[in-house]
Amino acid sequence: MPSLKDLKNRIGSVKNTRKITKAMQMVAAAKLRRAQEAAEAARPFAERMTAVMTGLAGSVGSSESAPRLLAGTGSDKVQLLVVMTAERGLCGGFNSSIVRLARAHAAKLLAEGKTVKILTVGKKGREQLRRDLGQHFIGHVDLSEVKRMGYPVAQGIARDVLDRFDKGEFDVATIFFARFQSVISQIPTAQQVIPAVFEGEGEVNSLYDYEPSEEGVLADLLPRGVATQIFTALLENGASEQGARMSAMDNATRNAGDMINRLTIQYNRSRQAAITKELIEIISGAEAL
């Protein structure tokens, strides 16, 4: 049975831990608010661009003059997986859920006889995937120095991906990230970005004249579309990470409080037992006299 001193030290240690987790929860809440605002600010631009490209893609269709980023290479043999995770942990199952989805997708592709290449964004995903898929790594993007996510970061990643596509290094590119729904709900998502996939209705092209041509405008917009999708995914990931961290630290703070209560009860009982024992010894000694 632990001594009173040991129990007191444990209570003090857990109280210090609770202070840390509470502070991390408050910091995550502030960062989450900023991340949500950034995602909401970028959404109208992304939606408008997607609508225009969807309309153009519908007009261009599968014609021979369709841009390569839309038509593809005609093969899906080589697949690039861009796995986006956080640089830090202590955010519940945020990182592992994205990695789990990417790992399952890679296993499915490998079982079909396809070639898999992996580009990691964020340290935590790279650490987890290295164990069984490290031989498929072709690059890594370090975000440890990025204080606030901006469009230039997404442009850099998109430029690397597009350069690899132009060199014929892969046929299909899919990004993996967590779509933010709420503080307690982040949905692991796989989204194909190359060749471009458009769903729903776009802009009515009869209202516009495109120069030099619809194909030319679409060819110019598609690389920007890839960067925009990556930027949106990074913003969603940022909000999801902070939401998951806020939830995890809230749980840790409440668990620490429960542990403090249990240890305090144990401490009081041990102290009471020690006092009772001393009183019995004093009374027994007095009776012996």
Swiss-Prot record:
Q: Which InterPro entries match?
A: ATP_synth_F1_ATPase_gsu, ATP_synth_F1_gsu, ATP_synth_F1_gsu_CS
- Respond yes or no to whether keyword RNA-binding is given for this record: no
- UniProt record, GO biological process: proton motive force-driven plasma membrane ATP synthesis
Report the superkingdom from the record: Bacteria
| GO CC list | plasma membrane; proton-transporting ATP synthase complex
GO MF annotation list: ATP binding; proton-transporting ATP synthase activity, rotational mechanism
Give the matching Pfam families: ATP-synt
Q: Where's it found, cell-wise? A: Cell inner membrane
Q: Where is this protein chiefly located?
A: membrane
Question: Its function?
Answer: Produces ATP from ADP in the presence of a proton gradient across the membrane. The gamma chain is believed to be important in regulating ATPase activity and the flow of protons through the CF(0) complex.
- What quaternary arrangement does the UniProt entry report? F-type ATPases have 2 components, CF(1) - the catalytic core - and CF(0) - the membrane proton channel. CF(1) has five subunits: alpha(3), beta(3), gamma(1), delta(1), epsilon(1). CF(0) has three main subunits: a, b and c.
The UniProt entry's sequence similarity note says: Belongs to the ATPase gamma chain family.
Name assigned to this protein: ATP synthase gamma chain
Q: Which organism is it from?
A: Cereibacter sphaeroides (strain ATCC 17025 / ATH 2.4.3)
